[in-house]
């Protein structure tokens, strides 16, 4: 049995057509079903519906053989027990710093609000910059407006939400897209099956971008 961990939303919507190219189609609509384990048209493949930030955990610990997660989630997770064999080139965006439009660069310690705490620590450590990281789970744009933080680090798609709140994107940390991740033990135990799926998905990604 192959178990694939996915999260609802944009990643799920963009991944299902790629899986369909490999003949893997859920027997129920994951967006409408309350089930968290969903069978597919292939008897030996099932989908797990989990939180986006939990996908790498399920895969690394072997609760799922494969998963699809954003590069931002994988960078923050930083686990060692999984392979990342394929960039699916879906759910593309940017991980960036942002601050109030026209604001002067703060002197001294920088206050940064983000849910990407590990990414932020690594990023500013590489710059040799002293920072105070403030962990938030949402509404990052609010932090600079009420002087909770000088800057934020967040995923930016169009930038409209930033601009609507008087902020502007500043430094690019990483270009983000969703990646296929594979449990290391599963790759050894079910190598032929998983490699075949990887190859099929790679062809689907390439044909989509050629077309």
UniProtKB/Swiss-Prot annotation:
Report a single Gene Ontology molecular function. ATP phosphoribosyltransferase activity
Reactions listed under catalytic activity: 1-(5-phospho-beta-D-ribosyl)-ATP + diphosphate = 5-phospho-alpha-D-ribose 1-diphosphate + ATP
The protein's UniProt keywords, in alphabetical order, are: Amino-acid biosynthesis, ATP-binding, Cytoplasm, Glycosyltransferase, Histidine biosynthesis, Nucleotide-binding, Transferase
Cellular component terms per the entry's GO annotation: cytoplasm
Which SUPFAM superfamilies does this UniProt record tie to the protein? Periplasmic binding protein-like II (SSF53850)
Its annotated function is as follows: Catalyzes the condensation of ATP and 5-phosphoribose 1-diphosphate to form N'-(5'-phosphoribosyl)-ATP (PR-ATP). Has a crucial role in the pathway because the rate of histidine biosynthesis seems to be controlled primarily by regulation of HisG enzymatic activity.
Q: What is known of its domains?
A: Lacks the C-terminal regulatory region which is replaced by HisZ.
Indicate the family of this protein: Belongs to the ATP phosphoribosyltransferase family. Short subfamily.
Query: Can you say what this protein is called?
Result: ATP phosphoribosyltransferase
């Amino acid at each position: 049995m192959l178990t694939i961990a996915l999260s609802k939303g944009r990643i799920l919507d963009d991944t299902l057509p790629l899986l369909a190219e490999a003949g893997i189609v859920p027997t129920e609509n994951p967006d409408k079903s309350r089930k968290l384990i969903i069978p597919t048209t292939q008897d030996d493949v099932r989908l797990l519906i989990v939180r986006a930030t939990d996908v790498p955990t399920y895969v690394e610990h072997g609760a799922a053989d494969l998963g699809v997660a954003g590069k931002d989630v994988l960078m923050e997770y930083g686990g060692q027990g999984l392979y990342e064999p394929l960039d699916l080139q879906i759910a593309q965006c940017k991980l960036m710093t942002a601050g109030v439009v026209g604001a002067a660069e703060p002197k001294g310690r920088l206050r940064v609000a983000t849910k990407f705490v590990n990414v932020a620590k690594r990023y500013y450590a590489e710059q040799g910059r002293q920072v105070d990281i403030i962990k938030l789970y949402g509404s990052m744009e609010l932090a600079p407006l009420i002087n909770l933080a000088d800057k934020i680090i967040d995923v930016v798609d169009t930038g409209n939400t930033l601009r609507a709140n008087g902020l502007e994107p500043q430094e690019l940390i990483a270009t983000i897209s969703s990646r296929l991740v594979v449990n290391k033990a599963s790759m050894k135990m079910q190598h032929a099956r998983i490699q075949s799926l990887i190859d099929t998905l790679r062809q689907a990604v390439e044909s989509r971008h050629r077309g």
